[in-house]
């Protein structure tokens, strides 16, 4: 590579392609929309365990082209995945039918983004994984029907064992 920026862009493209494969493979055989969200959070935690918390800040500050690729991934690919999950959850009657899909999908993407914001959640005080789990609980309890909330409890009970 002739310059570091090109290397970072190539690595970002590779990481995004890898994440899309991990997401798609992880969703194979999931039982329902609630389970799918738990799998997505597990995949996100797996990715975070191998990621320096300052990576996103550094990308944004020093590598704007690579940051733009990540933003596009988040705003288009992840947004569609969240939207699909919401539609599935409503069809399965685990999510409330009256939610505004576009608003809730965009809110979820912003929640994930916010979890990485060290100005909001300092890594000295909270692990990113802990923040994502709390935000996911808040998100799920807000969109789920009684039937869906029972599933949340079931999945949490299983994961504690």
Language-model-derived ranges and their functions:
Residues 26, 55-59, 119-122:
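Secondary-structure edge/capping motif, primarily at the C-terminal ends of alpha-helices
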Residues 10, 14, 21-54, 105-108, ...:
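Hydrophobic alpha-helical connector segments
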Residues 34-35, 73-74, 91-107, 125-134:
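All-alpha amphipathic helical-bundle segments outside canonical DNA-binding/catalytic cores
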Residues 43-51, 77, 111-118, 138-146:
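Phosphate/oxyanion-binding loops and surfaces in catalytic or ligand/nucleic-acid-binding neighborhoods
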Residues 84-88, 92, 122-161:
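C-terminal peripheral helix-coil segments that are non-catalytic and often amphipathic
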Residues 49-84, 91-103:
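Short secondary-structure transition hinges
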Residues 1-10:
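HTH DNA-binding helix-turn interface
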